[in-house]
Design a protein with these regions (language model features):
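Conserved NAD+-utilizing ADP-ribose enzyme module
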Residues: 2, 11-133
């Protein structure tokens, strides 16, 4: 349906929460993840349209921060690709190692943002073995 799923954050500090929201919106395995952010104005200036769609994430305060870039045509995908490249060149990206992801999960569990029981069995097992939770 020519869409691209994205998460809206207010600041760079929310990137980790967005990464966990993304990961917990599906059955996932522990892995590293790359995240880049694009300013809303860049999307507007490239005529990229979006609409809010609640996510099926386990992070309840991120459910309504999920958006779809909609009606994407070939040129739009090219524009988004160029925006991503520009952001990477301007150091507006973050790489979360597998350990960073585990730490984010543990932090979310300890802050009661995430219930460990909502995680896939294999992920729970690793967190229990490595962190004793």
């Amino acid at each position: 349906n020519d869409t691209l799923s994205v998460w809206k954050v207010s600041n760079e500090q929310e990137l980790g929460l967005a990464a966990i929201a993304y990961l917990t919106s599906r059955d996932f395995k522990l892995t590293s993840i790359h995240v880049t952010w694009i300013e809303e104005g860049c999307l507007i200036s490239n005529n990229i349209k979006w609409e809010q769609e609640n996510a099926s994430t386990k992070i309840s305060n991120m459910v309504d921060k999920h958006f779809n870039l909609i009606g994407l045509k070939h040129d739009d995908i090219g524009a988004i690709s160029n925006l991503i490249i520009q952001q990477i060149m301007n150091n507006k990206f973050k790489f979360f190692t597998e350990k960073n992801v585990k730490d984010l999960l543990i932090n979310s569990i300890e802050n009661n943002t995430l219930d460990i029981e909502d995680l896939p069995r294999k992920v729970k097992k690793v967190l229990k073995e490595e962190y004793g939770i």
